[in-house]
Amino acid sequence: MVIALIVVVSGTAAVIFAVFVLALFVFNRINNKRYNGNKFLKYFSADDFPGLLAEPISFLSDCGQTLRGFLYQRKECQPKALVIFAHGFGAGHRAYTTELNTIVQAGYWVLAYDATGCAESDGKNLRGFDQGVYDLCAAVRYANNCARFDGMKKILLGHSWGAFCVLNSLEEDGISGAVAMCGFISGAKVLSQNTIGKYFPALTFLEEAFLRLFYRMRFGRKANRNSLKSLRRTKKKVLLIYGDADRTVNYKKNGAVFLREFCGAENVVCMVCEGKAHNPYLTKDAERAMNETFSAIAAQKKKNYQKAVEMYARIDYAKITQEDRQVMRTVIEFCDSISAGQ
């Protein structure tokens, strides 16, 4: 009996230690490096879109690091409102220039920037998903302190990590509403879901607990922001958009959770894109082409790196960036309702 108990305790301790090591590895691998995009990919700029103007802007975030981006606008356009955009994990805001241009052409100014540790902004590393909330709040304060934006309604817009940031910045002064596409509940949850959760779902809670601890050690009492709790606290209008085939921010464990609680809420509009994955603002064909393209390149890298590099040069960007007009129209109409005070 005693021996059996010792075996059980030892086995349990070994599992806990293994999950701790995994959580520490995941935390460091994701958060402790910069994200400058893929040097072989083309990231669109304002020059790629007729009539789109980009004015450089910069501002300071929480630790004095400079964040850089652009104010996107059309010449001689009286803007309906200012849209403040938070990008997703990885490449910086220029991975979304096509979508930003669509919003500008609909009559908005768009303030978009690169988060700490990403692309053109300062920071030796990403620090963590909670850092994005600090950065977005800094962007909002920058906009609130600029005389040129006085009297303009301000709308938050974000995708993935950016949507998480948006949902946790709703109560900043001057924000009239928000659009959140494919946002996750918390940083610790989404990391554990995408690592141990894929192979040993029963241990997801344990890795999440360790990740929460690491985030607390890094960000203090404001660590571990929770999008569900933040959305419960606001009365501002919010549009939630999810693809029900999303496996990056697992739909059943994130989007479906939001929709079960908030669909029908007076201030929340929900849109589920059937058959869409993590980029619901794209057409299904564009999502499929993107996945096939990058899967083929990844497979080729294992065989012949130089041939994989050559494949980047043959990417059909028009095909993989084709927007879903209905989704983008929904976003713009929602922003229109906010700018009109409806």
Label for each model-derived stretch:
Residues 284-342:
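Catalytic active-site module of serine/aspartate enzymes centered on a nucleophile-bearing elbow/loop
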Residues 234-235, 240-246:
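Short beta-strand/loop motif that positions the catalytic acidic residue
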Residues 100-122:
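Conserved alpha/beta-hydrolase
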Residues 126-147:
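Alpha/beta-hydrolase active-site loop
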Residues 3-60, 70, 295-310:
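An N-terminal hydrophobic leader/cap segment in hydrolases
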Residues 89-102, 115, 252:
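The serine-hydrolase catalytic nucleophile loop
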Residues 168-220:
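Hydrolase active-site cap/lid region
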Residues 236, 250-261, 285:
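Short alpha-helix in the alpha/beta-hydrolase fold that links the catalytic acid
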